[in-house]
């Protein structure tokens, strides 16, 4: 049970000072109104000094209260004298500290076991800019920032519907992070919203600094390569998902908004698909899907063929392929693993360094090291070509980079040990695993499994807006269809 606020200003001040342990940024200002002592509690750097001075300290010094009773005086301050766009009443110490650390000024009077919270936030935030990871050719250039207030406003500006609901939770035992749930109450399934809300409340974490901290609690855990949740840094993308019955999860301090549930096929869709011509959209989507299978299977297939099935190599390429393998000290599997580990090492180093140095390291390191190992005869040219083609294909679907990287290594091992038969078996296991995954009751592979023919108009290709706009798609239909199939089987 949360501890209630004391009515004594002396006890309140002692409790605050004890809880903050003499923090240098703690501000405690005492004042007196009609013989009643008061206390203002805030943190330097989190509140706007101008707003605190103009709307709190100066008005309190000029006030001539008609009543000396603490309860009536507190109500007078709350309703007629102290104003803020974000004003609330706090009754527990937990909420008192949480509000103060979120940029609120807290006002308390002796004899009143409540505090008035005034939203005078003044901390610095990053301005709205274009997302770095989700570039588009047409449409908005706005991206989410680290402020939940700004992010909510960008969504509200695009979805001018009274059904757009925003709920606030405070998660993290130490961080008490402001987490917001966004959904359309007339579109999202109530059981989906309740499931997300419950899973977030059950998330027992000391810190919540990004939406990635919460993904494992809503989607699949670490044991699964694929997650049933997605992320976006674009408000227009989030609005499109909310209109399909999804739930958005915003974490204060992070520009990455989580979307749940998220289907596997959506990784191959972008916002530009809906602004381009349908025939070009179909071409690009099929290209992304081909790139996914290419980056996962091509290295393992090459290793399996040159190791166990050289008869499948075209006759004109046979001398080059087998000659490169026999001329190098490593096996085909060893070559592939060594080169991919080197590639991941260069990529990781380039990501962690400043942009100018990171780009130079990636380009120069790749060229110099690649040329050196080929000249030294450590690897063959065919393997270099396979690695380059695979790496480029991986960037066509950036949201799947993590599972793709692990799957690529797994298929290299399978191809190098079991050959093509092992590759086929491994691919079947991958498909079965994908079809068995669910998030919030929605199959990850919907609308392919379970099969929903009417959604094909926006799956591998996109129909024109004349047809696409005739019926709204709702992600809960996949769950309802699967339930119907299960009921039929039980019957």
Annotated model-derived regions:
Residues 1-297, 301, 315, 435-491:
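Membrane-embedded alpha-helical signal segments
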Residues 301, 311-491:
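Generic detector of multi-pass transmembrane helix bundles and their immediately adjacent loops
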């Amino acid at each position: 049970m949360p501890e209630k606020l004391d009515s004594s200003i002396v006890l309140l001040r002692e409790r605050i000072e004890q809880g903050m342990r003499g923090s240098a940024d703690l501000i405690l200002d005492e004042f007196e109104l009609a013989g009643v002592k008061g206390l203002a509690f805030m943190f330097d750097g989190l509140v706007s000094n101008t707003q605190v001075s103009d709307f709190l300290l100066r008005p309190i010094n000029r006030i001539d209260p008609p009543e000396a009773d603490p309860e009536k005086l507190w109500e007078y301050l709350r309703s007629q004298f102290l104003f803020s766009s974000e004003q609330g009443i706090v009754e527990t110490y937990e909420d008192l500290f949480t509000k103060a650390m979120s940029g609120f000024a807290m006002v308390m009077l002796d004899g009143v076991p409540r505090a008035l919270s005034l939203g005078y936030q003044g901390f610095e935030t990053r301005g709205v800019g274009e997302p770095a990871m989700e570039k588009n050719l047409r449409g908005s250039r706005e991206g989410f920032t680290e402020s939940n207030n700004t992010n909510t406003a960008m969504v509200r500006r695009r979805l001018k519907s009274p059904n757009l609901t925003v709920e606030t939770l405070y998660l993290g035992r130490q961080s008490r992070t402001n987490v917001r749930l966004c959904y359309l109450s007339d579109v999202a399934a109530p059981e989906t919203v309740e499931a997300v809300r419950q899973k977030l409340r059950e998330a027992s974490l000391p810190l919540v600094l990004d939406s990635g901290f919460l993904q494992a609690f809503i989607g699949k855990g670490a044991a699964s390569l694929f997650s049933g949740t997605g992320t976006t840094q674009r408000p227009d993308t989030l609005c499109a998902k909310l209109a399909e019955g999804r739930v958005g999860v915003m974490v204060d301090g992070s520009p990455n908004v989580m979307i749940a549930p998220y289907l596997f096929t959506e990784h191959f869709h972008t916002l530009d698909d809906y602004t381009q011509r349908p025939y070009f959209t179909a071409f690009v989507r099929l290209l992304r899907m081909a790139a996914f299978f290419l980056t996962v299977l091509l290295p393992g297939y090459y290793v399996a063929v040159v190791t166990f099935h050289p008869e499948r190599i075209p006759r004109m390429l046979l001398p080059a392929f087998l000659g490169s393998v026999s001329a190098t000290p490593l096996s085909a599997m060893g070559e592939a693993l060594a080169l991919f580990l080197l590639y991941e090492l260069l990529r990781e180093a380039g990501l962690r360094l400043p942009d100018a140095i990171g780009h130079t390291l990636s380009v120069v390191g790749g060229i110099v090291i690649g040329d050196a190992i080929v000249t030294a005869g450590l690897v063959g040219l065919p393997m270099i070509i396979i690695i380059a083609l695979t790496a480029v294909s991986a960037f066509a679907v950036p949201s799947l980079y993590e599972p793709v990287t692990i799957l690529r290594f797994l298929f290299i091992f399978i191809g190098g040990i079991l050959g093509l038969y092992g590759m086929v078996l491994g691919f079947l296991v991958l498909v079965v695993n994908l079809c068995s995954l669910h998030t919030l009751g929605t199959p990850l592979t919907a609308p392919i499994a379970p099969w929903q023919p009417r959604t094909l108009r926006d799956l591998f290709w996109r129909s024109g807006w004349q047809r696409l706009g005739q019926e709204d798609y709702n992600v809960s239909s996949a769950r309802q269809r699967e339930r119907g199939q299960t009921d039929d089987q039980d019957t």
